[in-house]
Amino acid sequence: MTRFVSSAINLLLVLVLGVSLSGCVTTRLPVASTSPWQALNLDTEANPLDVAFTDSRHGYLVGSNRMIRETNDGGATWNDRSLDLPEEENFRLISIDFNGDEGWIAGQPGLLMHTSDGGQNWTRLFLDTKLPGEPYLITALGSHSAEMATNVGAVYETHDDGGSWEALVTDAAGAVRDLRRGDDGSYVSVSSLGNFYATWQPGDSVWQVHQRVSSQRLQSIGYQPDGNLWMVARGAQIRLNDESGNLESWTKAIIPITNGYGYMDMAWDEDGAIWAGGGNGTLLVSRDGADSWEIDPVGDRQPSNFTRMVFDWDHAFVLGERGNLLRWVGNAV
């Protein structure tokens, strides 16, 4: 009888502990009372991958399955556009950028397009078949000029509308899962397996390799507003580069919430708040330098993984899957 009572008590303790743990996993963070985001659904199975504007109101959204949408109201509504591309190829439009009316689109497989009239007409530029890797990131630099990076870390620059390209690195970084460009022209990338990251500065001939900070594989990496780096690792771990110029100095792991979903991107808004987005509608915000976090109520209701955040001076978007995205409206929603 004593053994039975003891076993029953142990079982009860296990059940109580399990329930309490499962409860605190998803309710550990408070939900913000308001949100600056407006949810949009574009009624498509395509995944939005990038967005760019020619001015405060006119811009384009690109994505998988050849998706290209145009807005003339700052992103409140989006209209279908099409590109003159072979029907048999299912292009993935990964990156778009504008400098005024001059714009560029990079996609896969082997796609690069250029416009000089705000996107009303696009010209396909055919790349050398010996190009290392596939186009991954395009940056409009100014009149007739752009910089292109591939998914193996090759970096090229053109000053004649894409007629010719000059290699800026002699040795690519290797296959990458994430690659970002800083405002100063530097790059940072995460290896395809997430076991190291690499940095490149203008004028360098090769990438500099850095080992990951912990045993957790890296998911993504990017630039803070001050030029220092941030990184997201598996296990929903965030770290901030805390010593300017020292790429080996990082904060301890910041784990805002353990809900079984990782983070895929981070961004800072104009007020200095930090946003982190990830799986299953995970959208968190910190307004005190990552010390405390809140769940965004609009993001939390979305049936989508948030894969990318795009912030510029006039716009901000959180890109999801299957036509889901969030648009910054600023006012409380």
Swiss-Prot record:
Do the record's keywords include Transmembrane? no
Q: Name one GO biological process term.
A: photosynthesis
Where is a lipid covalently linked (N-palmitoyl cysteine)?
C24
What UniProt keywords apply to this chain's record, in alphabetical order? Answer: Lipoprotein, Membrane, Palmitate, Photosynthesis, Photosystem II, Signal, Thylakoid
Q: Which residues form the signal peptide?
A: 1-23
Membrane topology (UniProt): Lipid-anchor
Q: Where in the cell is it found?
A: Cellular thylakoid membrane
Q: Where is the lipid attached (S-diacylglycerol cysteine)?
A: C24
Give the SUPFAM superfamilies listed for this entry. Answer: Oligoxyloglucan reducing end-specific cellobiohydrolase
State where it is primarily located: membrane
One GO cellular component term of this record is: photosystem II
Do the record's keywords include Thylakoid?
yes
Quaternary structure, from the entry: Part of early PSII assembly complexes which includes D1 (psbA) and PsbI; not found in mature PSII. Binds to the lumenal side of PSII complexes. Interacts with YidC.
> What's this protein's function?
A factor required for optimal assembly of photosystem II (PSII), acting in the early stages of PSII assembly. Also plays a role in replacement of photodamaged D1 (psbA). Assists YidC in synthesis of chlorophyll-binding proteins.
Mind telling me which NCBIfam families this protein's record contains? PRK13684.1 (NF010237)
What is said about the domains?
Answer: A 7-bladed beta-propeller torus, about 55 by 55 Angstroms, with a depth of about 25 Angstroms and a central pore.
Q: Which family does it belong to?
A: Belongs to the Ycf48 family.
> What is this protein called in UniProt?
Photosystem II assembly lipoprotein Ycf48
